[in-house]
Amino acid sequence: MKADKLIGLIQPKKGNVNSILDLHETGCLGKITSFKDMLDGRYLIDLSGLARFKVTKEIKNNKSYRECEISFEDYQDDLIVKKEKLKFSDLELIFKDLKSLFEKKGYIINWKSLEKQNLNETINALAMASPFSLEEKQILLESQNLEIRKNKIAEILSTYSYDDFNNTTIQ
């Protein structure tokens, strides 16, 4: 952690019965902004997401962590700062539903602080901090751009709002 403070994060796939879990193809490169040693030997880390990547190959090793060869080719736009066509006003309904969901789940969010960030950072932070399932967060991570991610968040929120944000399974 002393070198460049970069780490790649990839979620395991759900429903895996192997002792070594299969990984999703898409992950995110993050920069460690702070970390703390916990008394039980774990680390508590804060990350800033930099760019998404695709796993091209997993490298076998005997380490306590997994290593992969990755490509940023599909997500080159993550590295370019660009003006988004969306405005905060385009997201009023989504923010209203997210606030309801976060309150229902007991999350405390500083909305004023979020609105000071650029729209892309705000949407990404809310998507990853949300009480969505790992599969739902993976769908958001893989969304190609902010407009698609906004629409996916709206779709996910509509399933939660159906049962007043209790997220009970409907069959």
Where are these regions (language model features)?
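Core structural elements
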Residues: 114-132
